[in-house]
């Protein structure tokens, strides 16, 4: 089972190209900060603006740089089932431990369509799959009932839940079993999510505060919820500020404030965060005692 603080990695760019040197350094920072796994090529990694060749290369670089120190859960989502399967097969070949597969976006399949999509992938994928439910981005929302059906398939081992509905953690635990890996997709809800049966977070904030995020998850796992609450108070302004503009723009800005070699460059249609967002990020970094 995947547990703890799992950064959803940003993908650094410079002059329009993948900045491999900076990315490798970022991977090392995440691991040295206590992260328990890594997720490249997800939403935070701007996978939507990568070519398939770039996607596969970034994934492979991440796996190479980890050197087996932590597992890699590769972003393998697409709204084309066969493309998603191709990503899963490439991830397996590169050495990923699992694939994170977001609900198909834009084409808005029915619940039966979602079941067909994931069951096809489960039948054909060489690695385990975690379902990623983020209705705010996909306009699709997997039901507890559909999730329960899918959880019976051996290759479907868990989910990243960014639905924003905290009560679902209990409903999904009862429907899918306590061994079904539930990871929060919302940093600001991670404390409550873990208290209700979650086992970690695929985190945006961990890009900026890997050690604090890992310490927070460790406190939750050890039932030290007063310690976890203190860390949540320290991190909460950052959780909020990092979504004060289109993600991952604020995250990249924060990293550029912390590391001189990290460019805040994004790919269109994303643009730099507003001055207001930058001010919120600066204040949050100060509150967390990171600057």
Curated annotation (Swiss-Prot):
Binding site for pyruvate: 44, 202
Reaction catalyzed: L-aspartate 4-semialdehyde + pyruvate = (2S,4S)-4-hydroxy-2,3,4,5-tetrahydrodipicolinate + H2O + H(+)
Keywords: Amino-acid biosynthesis, Cytoplasm, Diaminopimelate biosynthesis, Lyase, Lysine biosynthesis, Schiff base
Record site: Part of a proton relay during catalysis: 43, 106
Main location: cytoplasm
Alphabetized Gene3D superfamilies for the sequence: Aldolase class I
Gene Ontology CC terms, in alphabetical order: cytosol
Location within or outside the cell: Cytoplasm
InterPro entries xrefs: Aldolase_TIM, DapA, DapA-like, Schiff_base-form_aldolases_AS, Schiff_base-form_aldolases_CS
Subunit structure: Homotetramer; dimer of dimers.
Function: Catalyzes the condensation of (S)-aspartate-beta-semialdehyde [(S)-ASA] and pyruvate to 4-hydroxy-tetrahydrodipicolinate (HTPA).
Name of the protein this chain belongs to: 4-hydroxy-tetrahydrodipicolinate synthase
Native source organism of the sequence: Zymomonas mobilis subsp. mobilis (strain ATCC 31821 / ZM4 / CP4)
């Amino acid at each position: 089972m995947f547990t703890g603080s799992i950064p959803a990695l940003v993908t650094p760019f410079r002059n329009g190209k993948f900045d491999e040197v900076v990315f490798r350094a970022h991977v090392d920072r995440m691991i040295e900060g206590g992260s328990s796994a890594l997720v490249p090529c997800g939403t935070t990694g701007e996978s939507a603006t990568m070519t398939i060749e770039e996607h596969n290369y970034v994934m492979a670089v991440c796996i190479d740089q980890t050197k087996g120190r932590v597992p890699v859960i590769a972003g393998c989502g697409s709204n084309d089932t066969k493309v998603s399967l191709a990503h899963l097969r490439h991830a397996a070949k590169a050495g990923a431990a699992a694939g994170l597969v977001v609900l198909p976006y834009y084409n808005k399949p029915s619940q039966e369509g979602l079941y067909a999509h994931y069951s096809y992938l489960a039948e054909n994928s060489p690695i385990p799959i975690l379902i990623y439910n983020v209705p705010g981005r996909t306009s699709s929302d997997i039901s507890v009932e559909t999730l329960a059906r899918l959880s019976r398939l051996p290759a479907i081992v868990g989910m990243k839940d960014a639905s924003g509905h905290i009560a679902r953690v209990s409903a999904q635990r009862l429907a899918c079993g306590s061994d079904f890996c539930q990871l929060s997709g919302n940093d600001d809800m991670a404390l409550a999510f873990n208290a209700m049966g979650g086992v970690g977070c695929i985190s945006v904030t961990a890009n900026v505060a890997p050690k604090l995020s890992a310490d927070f998850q460790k406190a939750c796992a050890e039932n030290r919820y007063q310690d976890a609450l203190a860390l949540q108070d320290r991190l909460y302004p950052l959780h909020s500020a990092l979504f004060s503009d289109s993600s991952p723009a604020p995250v990249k800005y924060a990293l550029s404030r912390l590391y001189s070699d990290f460019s805040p460059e994004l790919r269109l249609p994303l643009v730099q965060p507003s001055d207001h967002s930058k001010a919120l990020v600066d204040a949050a970094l100060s509150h967390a005692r990171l600057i």
